[in-house]
Amino acid sequence: MKNIILIVSLLLMGVSSRADILNSSDNKNVADKFDPMLKAALFQMKIIADTSSILLSDIDYVEDLELKTSLWINNDVNRAKTTRHEITSLKGLEYFSSLRRLKLVGNRTDTLECIPDFSRFKELRELEIIQIYLPKLDISGCKNLTNLSCRSCDLNTIDLKKNIQLRTLDCTYNRLIELDLSHNKQLRTVIVKSQRNKGLLSEGGRAGILSKLILPDNRSNTEGISILECSDNNLEKLDISRSPHLRKINCSWNKLKALETSHNQELRELNCEANYIGELDFSANLKMEFLTCGLQGYEWIRQEGNDYRLLKKLILPEQKENVEGGSLRKLSIKEISEEAIPVFSDYPYLKELNCADNRLKTIDLSANIYLEVLDCSSNAISQLDLHSNVNLYSLNILNCPLQVLDLSQTKVKLIMCDFYDRREKGVKNGYISGLYLKLIVPKGYH
């Protein structure tokens, strides 16, 4: 019996000794480890009570922290005067070991003298860094990270292989040339648009520099990436065949010459304009609702001597109303070849149509009774019948040789048409036969 009591006593002594060590560590004053302006900011946010004394136990409870590098500090006891100060170092931030969410906001040109090793934040779930110069980012130790946003930071390299819990990634406005996401199968949203070198244009007048993007293989998963934004880059290829759960894609303003979407049957919204694509087949995308695919080889970015209306073939999905909302609602086909222009009556559920600059002489919209927004500017249309378009409220007819337009059956509130001087120029060039355009507007228009 005495032996048992002795063993229990020794165990209790061991626990007590360990607690003493922890308490000793928690009571350590680390104020001198912090940058003075960072301490001032923490004091102003009431995270610490005294800038001369910061105990680990004082900040261990902090799980959510948002810091701005610019702060206003009161100069007198009456709080009547404040001055602006800049945090130039994040020294000391590493002592916030319990952080689950961290947001850092700078002023675009901010270059901080000391940036913590983010891998030390083992509990971190969300990390957001905005406008802070950060060419490299090591988050390999943040195994629980689910949301990462690093925008306008001049980031030129990032390794996400160990961040397999990542669900949302936003690296907008950085300098990434390659991005490998093959290990990140939990991703749902990927935003990597506008990777560029400031002030420099690449071949073709484009600014984007991201030339390689590897997406995870989600074919065997019940979920996967549903939103992909990679516009304004330098991509010549984009493989989305292993991403069957994609619902929204914006890959506009790249250098794509082809885009295969037959494996993306959940696709609802696609913007692939301003690439170099000659053929597009969306027959397998029966749930498509919003499509923007014009400007292929757009005049401003075309290669010298090439036709800038590169899209010669366009196959749209067959329209089946009430199939999970799967009918085309918005279509933008600016500057495409005449042979690629679809028959609009085949898409009766359209609400928005942009067919500008397509050399059209006539346009039949009699079947499009749901149409609300129409842009048919810069065409050769001299007559336009809108009697069936009773829901139309926005119309753009700039640079069209119309003489009379009856809008009395529509709900038009916004009309864009030529000024007198522009029509005068059109008459001189023989493009328009008369100076005036007569508009018959609906009752109550003002």
Predicted regions and their residues:
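Asparagine/serine/threonine-enriched low-complexity, disordered tracts
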Residues: 142, 163, 174, 184, ...
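N-terminal capping/linker segments that flank leucine-rich repeat
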Residues: 14-108, 117-122, 126-128, 143, ...
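Conserved hydrophobic beta-strand positions in leucine-rich repeat
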Residues: 65-71, 80, 102-105, 125-129, ...
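Leucine-rich repeat
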Residues: 110, 135, 156, 177, ...
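Consensus "Asn ladder" position of solenoid repeat domains
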Residues: 107, 132, 153, 174, ...
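Acidic/polar low-complexity surface segments
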Residues: 194-208, 217-220, 224, 295-306, ...
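Sec-dependent N-terminal signal peptides
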Residues: 4-13
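Canonical leucine-rich repeat
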Residues: 90-93, 112-118, 137-139, 158-160, ...
